[in-house]
Amino acid sequence: MVTEHIFDFEWRPLQNYLRDRDIAIPPFAAEQESRSDALYNWIVSKGYSGKEGLNLGTYYHISDYGVIGLALLCAENVGDILKVIRAYVKLFNRDIANVGVKPRENYEVEIHISVNFKPEWNDASRQFHVNVIASATYKLIMDLLGNDFPISALTVPVHGADKTIYEGFFSLPVKHEGNDIIFSFPAHQLNRTLATANPAVFQSALTMAGESFNALLEVEMGGLRQRIELFLDSIPDQYPSLVTTAKYLRMNERTVRRRLADEGCTYRQIVDKARKERAIALLLNSSIPVDRISDILGYSETASFRHAFRRWTGQSTTEFRNSFH
């Protein structure tokens, strides 16, 4: 079995935080945990204030998350961002136990972040850790979605710390209760499209992220079928064969067939659905000739495309186009 490399994403922000404070990085034994884990635990052990935890969180940038950061930047909407984050947390981030989405009254949702603590940490260390995660999450939201993203409220658990620093730092109403960090915002924002959305780059980033991450993301996205649908949606012209798609997914063809059968569909059915949706979009939103649309969708003959379109819609391509003009 090939062991996937776990990238040490956290080293750079920790290094920059200490550099700006003229604090030397101590040496760590080679057999210790990852360098960033060792350095972070060392920082926590220094007894810095809760405000310093908030400051450290601002040092985390999208680029510090590697190809996962690229996937976040190019995701279609906020809902997809959360799916990527949940998969990332399960595989890479040992500081966070879980990220959950909970609907609330008044058409709002809450993003709950459950935090892990080291057994030896005291209240001050726990507060520092909570503040780092709250601040880094807030910065990630602002970097991805813009400073106008409407966060309506924030909950930050307090472990005997100064409560006066939070509202000024976040410029938000902040509550202090429970055990989770909670960001609240209008539910319809889950469908908000990112200005940086790019389906092709999103799919490319996922191929670089490793098999374990993709397996977790597939679960978050609702199965292999939806993963393939998103992949096909990112392709501007003729759809690939099952063999090519299987290579992209880093699976063999037989595994893809079996997994799709378990989900009650076939690759051909998924491609057929994708062709139908793209054909309708091209006929409605462009003046591209029908024979060119047939080529784009991968049909060897225009007659085959016309026959398929009538099967899908009960209309000819001409009838369909004329009915909307």
UniProtKB/Swiss-Prot annotation:
<dbReference type="InterPro" id="IPR032687">
    <property type="entry name" value="AraC-type_N"/>
</dbReference>
<dbReference type="Pfam" id="PF12625">
    <property type="entry name" value="Arabinose_bd"/>
</dbReference>
<dbReference type="InterPro" id="IPR009057">
    <property type="entry name" value="Homeodomain-like_sf"/>
</dbReference>
<keyword id="KW-0805">Transcription regulation</keyword>
<dbReference type="GO" id="GO:0001216">
    <property type="term" value="F:DNA-binding transcription activator activity"/>
</dbReference>
<comment type="function">
    <text>Transcriptional regulator involved in both the repression (at least 99 genes, such as mexR and algU) and in the activation (at least 203 genes, such as mvfR, rsaL, vqsR and rpoS) of regulatory or putative regulatory proteins which are implicated in quorum sensing, virulence and multidrug resistance.</text>
</comment>
<feature type="domain" description="HTH araC/xylS-type">
    <location>
        <begin position="226"/>
        <end position="323"/>
    </location>
</feature>
<keyword id="KW-0010">Activator</keyword>
<keyword id="KW-0238">DNA-binding</keyword>
<dbReference type="GO" id="GO:0032993">
    <property type="term" value="C:protein-DNA complex"/>
</dbReference>
<dbReference type="GO" id="GO:0003700">
    <property type="term" value="F:DNA-binding transcription factor activity"/>
</dbReference>
<keyword id="KW-0673">Quorum sensing</keyword>
<keyword id="KW-0804">Transcription</keyword>
<feature type="DNA-binding region" description="H-T-H motif">
    <location>
        <begin position="290"/>
        <end position="313"/>
    </location>
</feature>
<feature type="DNA-binding region" description="H-T-H motif">
    <location>
        <begin position="243"/>
        <end position="264"/>
    </location>
</feature>
<dbReference type="InterPro" id="IPR018060">
    <property type="entry name" value="HTH_AraC"/>
</dbReference>
<keyword id="KW-0678">Repressor</keyword>
<dbReference type="Pfam" id="PF12833">
    <property type="entry name" value="HTH_18"/>
</dbReference>
<dbReference type="GO" id="GO:0045893">
    <property type="term" value="P:positive regulation of DNA-templated transcription"/>
</dbReference>
<protein>
    <recommendedName>
        <fullName>HTH-type transcriptional regulator VqsM</fullName>
    </recommendedName>
</protein>
<dbReference type="GO" id="GO:0009372">
    <property type="term" value="P:quorum sensing"/>
</dbReference>
<dbReference type="GO" id="GO:0000976">
    <property type="term" value="F:transcription cis-regulatory region binding"/>
</dbReference>
